[in-house]
């Protein structure tokens, strides 16, 4: 029983979300429309958006793979287009 409790506590910590991933999506105030990905904490998925090119925050990734790796998204979760 103690083993199971320890296992679930460790598993929960290992899938914790990076603090940057909890930041809201920020398009920025320029008009470049660069394809990027951000972690949507509501859907618990990385989603595509168009980044303006300036401003923004750390929840802004060049690739889906980078977003999933940094934010701990499991591969069974599919991306959602925005």
UniProtKB/Swiss-Prot annotation:
- Alphabetized CDD domains for the sequence: Kunitz_actitoxin-like (cd22633)
Q: State the name under which the record lists this protein.
A: U-actitoxin-Avd3q
Question: What do the Gene Ontology cellular component annotations say?
Answer: extracellular region; nematocyst
Tell me where it resides: Secreted; Nematocyst
Q: Which Pfam families match?
A: Kunitz_BPTI
Query: Keywords, A to Z?
Result: Disulfide bond, Ion channel impairing toxin, Nematocyst, Potassium channel impairing toxin, Protease inhibitor, Secreted, Serine protease inhibitor, Signal, Toxin, Voltage-gated potassium channel impairing toxin
What's one GO MF term for it?
potassium channel regulator activity
Signal sequence segment: 1-16
Q: Note the InterPro entries from the entry.
A: Kunitz_BPTI, Kunitz_BPTI_sf, Prtase_inh_Kunz-CS, TFPI/VKTCI-like
For site (Reactive bond), what residue positions does UniProt give? Answer: 31-32
Family, according to the entry, reads as follows: Belongs to the venom Kunitz-type family. Sea anemone type 2 potassium channel toxin subfamily.
Q: Keyword NAD: yes or no?
A: no
Tell me the function of this protein.
Answer: Serine protease inhibitor that inhibits both tissue and plasma kallikreins. Has hemolytic activity. Inhibits voltage-gated potassium channels (Kv).
Q: What is its main location?
A: secreted
S-S bonds: 21-71, 30-54, 46-67
Domain BPTI/Kunitz inhibitor intervals: 21-71
**SUPFAM superfamilies per record:** BPTI-like
Positions of the propeptide removed during maturation: 76-82
